[in-house]
Every structure is written in C-alpha cells, then in structure tokens.
C-alpha cells in the first residue's frame, strides 16, 4: 500500500488579488495555483487616491478566497482535495476593520455596506496622519514607551491610528463599533467558525509589528494610555486580547460551512494568519543572519536574530522587532520602503502622458516604456556626477518613518535624458535599500547574506544587478514566484502536525535559488560617492 500523500493550501492575500497555492507537503512542489482579483477593488470603489484613502470591502476577500481555492483544487482533482490536511494564510498589514460584538466587520451590516470607513483599511492608506501624531506625542510623554519595539515611531499605516481615524469621522460607526480585527486574524477566525473578538486567535506577527503588543507590558498598551488618546480605544482594549500565537500554531479546525464553500474536508488544520512579507521570508528559507528583501510595488526587509545576539537592544527607526513574528524562538525585525516598483510605475505614467493625451496611443506601447528605458539605462556610463534622486515619493517608511517627506531629483542639466532619470530613480530605490541594511548593521543586527523574492527580484536583472553593485554583496533570488503562499503552506504543514518545527518544514519544502547577482566592486566604488550624495540630498549626512 502506497503511503498517503498530504497536500497543503497556502493562501496569499495581496493588495489586488488573492492567490491559492496547492503544495505537496513532502517536498514543497507546487501542484497548481489560482489567482482571483478583488472585484470591487478592481473597479476602484471606495478609494480616493488623491487623499491617500484605500479601502477594501470584506466581501472582496470572502468571494475571492472561495473562488481561488475552488479553482486551484479543480486543477488538481478530487483526490488531491480530499488529501489536503491544512490551510494557512498571509495578508497585507496593517489592514484592519471595525467590528460589532460578534466580530463581524461593520461593512457587512446593511447600514454600513457602502461606508468606506466601515471597510478594511488597506496597508497603504495614509489618512490617519494626524491620529498617528497624537499617538506618538503621547508615547513620548508616557512612563512606558509603547513605541520602543516599533522603531520609536508609530505609523499612520498601523491599526490604532487607522481605527481612531475611522471612529472620529462617523458618529454612526462610533456607536456601532465594538472592536477591531486585522485581515489575517479575521480570515482564520472565519474558517474555524468563531469570530468573537475576545476569543479569536491573534497573530503575534501583526500584533507585535502593528499594534504595539509586547509581552513586557502585558500585551497591548495599557487601557489608561489608550483612553488618553481616545476614551473609546480604552473600551476597545477590554474587547481585544492579551495573548498572541506564532505562525506555527493551529488555531482550530475547518468548520463545516467553510469546508463546503471551499470544497475541502471539514476538520483540517487552520493555521495562523500573518503578514505577507514575514511569511514570504519563511518561504524563502530565512535563517538567522539572512536578510530577505520582498520586492514589489513597495519593499519589506525581514531579518531574524537570536535572543543572545539581540539581548535588550532595540533598533531605532525600523518597523518593529517582535519575538516570534517570523520564526518561533527568534526575534523578527521588519523594515521597508514605501515605494519601490511604484516609483518606476510613476515615471512610466509621466512618460506616457503625452502618448495618451495627444497621440491616443495603444496601451501596449505604454507597456514597452520601462523595457526601453531599462535597455538604454543599462548602456549609460556610471559617473559620480550622474543625477541623483530621492525615493520618498510616498514618504519614508525606514529608516526613521516620516510619511510627509517627498521625493526629489538633483543634478539635472539640459543634457539629462529620460533613461538617465530612470537610472537615477532605480539607483534611489536601491540606495534606500542600502540605508536600511546599514541601519540594521549599525544597531548590531547580524546580516551574513541577502535573499530576494517578489516580482522585481524575478523579472528585473537591471534592478537586481544595480542592488548588488550598490550594496556590495551577492544577492540570491529565490526560485519561486509564490514564496508568500509557499511560506503559508509551510506554516500549514506545522499546524497540521506534519513537521515538528518551521525550520524542519523549510528544509523539506524550500525551493532553492534561480539567480545570483555578484557585485562589481569597481562600480561599487562609484556608487559609494553617489550614495553619499543621496544621503546629503535627504539631509542625512
């Protein structure tokens, strides 16, 4: 009799769509996947980009989850579906929503179905600037510094600021709201059939990095601190949590309703949801001393360190350090850039404007712009006098968060070409990446090697070679387009009891590497001088 083959589902909720990946638990091989776009988001409903408002309806998540799982399983057949033994997730973060006492996001109630402030507030929403300032001002005066493990600054992208902003805009929401839930916690709660705010499992990853949760002060900030920000937040504190769980935990079993909706057997293990970049780092094979760069529209940089290495030290100016947020038993560090690929897309739109407005060009012509710019930029000579840009078009996430700073270009002449400007923008994003690496090293976080995942890492040799030359170390690209979903499947494998630890699952299931970029040290010497100009342009020298 052949031994039973076990399969796992890793579900990756991105900014625009959800991806379901079917994985063989024995070796991580990918059987099938399906990607389903969020239908309302695709129509740009409930968003106001001019005011940095980005909202997603909870039905987008529910409908797309159901469709993606069913499509992926249909590509495998019934035998595979019946042999799935675990499912886990990653989502963007902080992407929270206000809920009622049952844990239902308020946008699922008829009276708030079209109210953007009742929906999930997407990670890149920057409407809560004033509320973040209030939290930071109070934290600097409070006896306990609740931002200590958040890099010293609480961001407008994080849950307390976002929920406070929504509560203050609508008296109706303020009266109806009982608690809040992060996207990743809501999905796992849905699947086990219990969304009660006081009892659902809460992810250590998102709680520690986005909600100022830390064991040293008993979990979330004290009720008195939250009440001083707004009395309702203090009340919410009693409807939330003190304990959290790491990504390897099983939060429960798939309930009958959701088993039927997804086409799975009831009772399979449901894992803990966590932040996409952290889960992607697991899928990449992160170990202590490895920096994983998750490279897409923005970036996220993930490192893990041992307790002996880190001790009581805190790293200033990053997005947090949390015990067990990536690998259980290790400190997880998060940093990142607010715009990376988005910066290249912005310049493409600038270049395409006359084509659209005057020539009425074919959209396929616009798609060629970055490819042509890249080809020409690769041929340009590299000199210390080249134009230099700042990559802060969407503010600065790290080092030292400041959403109000803006991008810049320096050193332009009448001879500066479009490819030269594009080259400067690529270099600026990579200089921003180097600044993060240097901050980690300055603060005593060991980094021995760099791995890269994400669309840019897989698709842009120009950007990756520039990064290797600027940073001056080799960079290996992980051989999977779906590292986040694969990392979620690894967590599902541990939750289902197939492996005794995340590291054991990684050893069996990690995909290896597809490319390695080695630095050109002659170019690195020139980039050192350009990097110094970048730092001076941003007032950081």
Residue ranges and their predicted role:
Residues 158, 212-328, 355-356, 361-375, ...:
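ATP-dependent carbohydrate kinase catalytic cores
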Residues 1-108, 235, 260, 264-269, ...:
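N-terminal glycine/serine-rich phosphate-binding loop of ATP-dependent small-molecule kinases
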Residues 157, 335, 343-345, 350-359, ...:
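Acidic, glycine/GT-rich loop-and beta-edge segments that sit at the periphery of enzyme/chaperone cores
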Residues 130-133, 279-283, 338-341, 345-348, ...:
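Glycine-rich phosphate-binding/hydrolytic loop that grips phosphoryl groups
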Residues 65-75, 257, 285, 421-448, ...:
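Phosphate/ATP-binding catalytic cores across multiple sugar-kinase/actin-like superfamilies
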């Amino acid at each position: 009799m052949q031994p039973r083959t076990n399969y796992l589902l890793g579900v990756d909720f991105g900014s625009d769509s959800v991806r379901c990946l079917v994985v063989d638990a024995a070796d991580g091989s990918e059987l099938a996947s399906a990607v389903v776009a969020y239908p309302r988001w695709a129509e740009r409903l409930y968003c106001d980009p001019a005011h940095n408002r980005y909202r997603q309806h909870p039905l987008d998540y529910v409908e797309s989850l159901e469709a993606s799982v069913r499509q992926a399983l249909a590509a495998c057949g019934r035998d595979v579906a019946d042999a799935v033994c675990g499912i886990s997730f990653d989502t963007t973060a902080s992407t929270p929503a206000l809920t009622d006492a049952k844990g239902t996001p308020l946008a699922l109630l008829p009276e708030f179905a079209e109210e953007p402030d009742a929906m999930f507030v997407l990670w890149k929403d920057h409407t809560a600037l004033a509320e973040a300032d209030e939290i930071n001002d109070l934290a600097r005066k409070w006896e306990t510094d609740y931002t200590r493990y958040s890099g010293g600054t609480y961001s407008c992208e994080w849950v307390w600021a976002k929920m406070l902003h929504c509560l203050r805009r609508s008296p109706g929401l303020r009266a109806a709201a009982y608690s809040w839930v992060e996207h990743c916690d809501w999905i796992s709660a849905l699947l086990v059939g219990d969304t009660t705010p006081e009892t659902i499992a809460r992810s250590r990853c998102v709680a520690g990095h986005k909600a100022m949760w830390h064991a040293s002060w008993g979990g979330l900030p004290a009720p008195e601190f939250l009440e001083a920000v707004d009395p309702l937040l203090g009340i919410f504190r009693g409807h939330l949590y003190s304990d959290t769980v790491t990504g390897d935990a099983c939060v429960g079993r798939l309930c009958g309703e959701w088993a039927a909706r997804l086409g799975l057997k009831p009772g399979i293990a449901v894992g803990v949801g966590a932040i996409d970049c952290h889960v992607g780092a697991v899928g990449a094979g992160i170990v202590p001393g490895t920096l994983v760069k998750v490279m897409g529209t923005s970036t996220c940089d993930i490192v893990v360190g041992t307790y002996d290495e880190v001790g009581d030290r805190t790293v200033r100016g990053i997005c947090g350090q949390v015990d067990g947020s990536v690998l259980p038993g290790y400190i997880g560090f998060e940093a990142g850039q607010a715009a990376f690929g988005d910066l290249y897309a912005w310049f493409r739109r600038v270049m395409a404007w006359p084509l659209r407005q005057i020539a009425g060009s074919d959209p396929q012509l616009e798609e060629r712009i970055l490819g042509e710019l890249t080809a020409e930029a690769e041929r340009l000579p590299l000199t210390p006098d080249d134009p230099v840009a700042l990559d802060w078009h969407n503010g600065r996430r790290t080092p030292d968060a400041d959403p109000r700073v803006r991008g810049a270009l320096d050193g332009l002449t009448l001879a500066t070409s479009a490819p030269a400007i594009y080259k400067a923008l690529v270099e600026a994003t990579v200089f921003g990446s180097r600044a993060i690496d240097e901050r980690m090293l300055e603060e005593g976080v060991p980094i021995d090697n760099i791995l890269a995942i994400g669309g840019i890492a897989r698709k842009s040799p120009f950007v990756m070679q520039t990064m290797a030359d600027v940073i001056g170390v080799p960079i290996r690209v992980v051989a999977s387009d779906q590292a986040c979903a694969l990392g979620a499947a690894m967590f599902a494998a541990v939750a289902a009891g197939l492996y005794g630890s995340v590291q054991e699952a990684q050893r069996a299931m990690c995909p290896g590497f597809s490319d390695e970029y080695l630095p050109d040290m002659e170019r690195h010497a020139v980039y050192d001088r350009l990097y110094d100009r970048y730092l001076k342009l941003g007032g950081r020298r």
